[in-house]
Amino acid sequence: MNSIAILVARILLALLFLVSAVRQTIYRRGVEQEMAAHGMIYTPFLLGCAILIELTGGLSLILGYATLWGVLELITFTLASTFIYYRRLLDRDQLNHALKNLAIIGGLLMIAAVGPGTFGIDGAMAAR
C-alpha cells in the first residue's frame, strides 16, 4: 500500500508540471509577455529552460527514474517561480499562490525523503 501511495503522489505532482509545460509550449507568446511584465529578460531562452525543467522533472517523477535529481530540479524551479511571481504577500491572492507553491515543495520534499517506492525504475533497480 505504501508504494502505491508514493506512486500516486508522484503522478499527481508530476501532472502539475507536465500540464504546465504543455500549456507553456502552446501559449508560448503569451507566457513570454507575462514573463517580461514581471521584469524578466531573455524570455524565449528562460521559457525554454522552464519547459525543459518541467518536462524532465515531471517525467522523472512519473517514471521513478533519477527521482531525487528530478525532485531537486522541481523544488529549485518552484522556489524561484514563487519569488519571481508572488512578491506582494500582503495581497491575498498572491499569498495563496505562494502558499500553494510551498505546499508543492513540501510534497516534493516528502518524495525526496522516502524515495520513489518500488513502482519506478529507481525502486526496481534498488530491489535487484
Predicted feature residues:
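Extended, low-polarity transmembrane helix blocks
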Residues: M1-G30, A36, I41-T56, I62-R128
